[in-house]
Amino acid sequence: FVFRPRFSYGKTDNTNGQNSYTFSQDPGYTTDELFGTDDLTSLVSEEDIINTVLKNTLKKGDDLTVGGSVLVNRRLGKLGRNITFRGKYNYTNSSSEQFSTSETEYFQKTPEERMEILNRYITTPTKSYDYSARLTYSEPIFTGGFLQFSYNFQYKHSTTDNSTFDMGDNWTIGDGVNESNPGVLNNDLSKSAAYNYYNHQMDVTFRWIREKMRLNAGVSFQPQKSDLSYKKGDLDTTTVRNVFNFTPTFDFRYNFSKTSQLRLRYRGQASQPNMVDLLPISDNTDPLNIQNGNPGLKPTFTNELRAEYNFFNTEKQRGMFSFFRYQNIMNNISDRKVYDPETGGYVTTPENINGNWNLTGMVGTNIALRNKKYTINTFTRANYQNMVSYISEKDL
């Protein structure tokens, strides 16, 4: 019987200042020259200036997490027959406040739309908890052979209530928010969400243990259900998603000797898109970084193969270790950004994309000199990544 409690508390308080200019082409001046002038148009023509942004932000937050885990194992008579229970629970209570002032001048818009002042106060309290229970049973079927059955249930719940307040044009961060200056609630930008996640996982694993060999092969079945209640402006929706994940696993280990070993592993894993990303919504809290949802997103599936080999000669004090990994991701989720030449901002939409894979290999050696008082160590590593993203004349 093992019990491990968990407790953590964190507090944040940071400020950030941003001063940026966006041009349609290279302005031909250094950063110091551009930011040092009182009249930007004296250096660059208005036709080449997209926007100028002056922004200051203060963020405050605190985070409290408590939880624990328990492990109970009991042997049931016959050698190799046992039952194990694992349980976990976590609770998190966090809150954040953001005070921001922003002054953006759009040089390519009409005089009425040219200047945009956004002074805002945003508060985001969040509460979440999750728990899981896993029961595992192992049954010997022949000498060195075992069948292992396990069932795991996991539940997650979280609530977030984001309230955005518009402050006056002359408001500063130092003024704060109080009864005399409460701000005006912006219903179009404020949002709340309640999320529930249910996961049932059934695993069947075959284990074969010999003097020089160990083999684990199995499959995992995961029926999942998620529901999201989301409110933002006039949108009030509840989305329910039911999925079924199938995950194969393979782990083979062979000992050529006590100091030489080969290991091969494979795992496939499916992951689902974020529920908010599946909603047909557009979040323009930041006018220069508009976030869109995409109801057509597909699940992502990752294949990973690993190989390891090492040996060591104790008499000659020489050894080698090597590692190889291949990973490819099907239907990877990537952000597609579309540039708006009038504002200098971006509209971001998550979309599926294929063609992402990577290879990693490494080899290390340890060679002792003749007197064995000195050794020469080498380490070689190679990595290749094939990364695919959306890019064109206007998309980035």
Residues covered by each model-derived region:
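Primarily recognizes Gram-negative and organellar outer-membrane beta-barrels
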Residues: 1-396
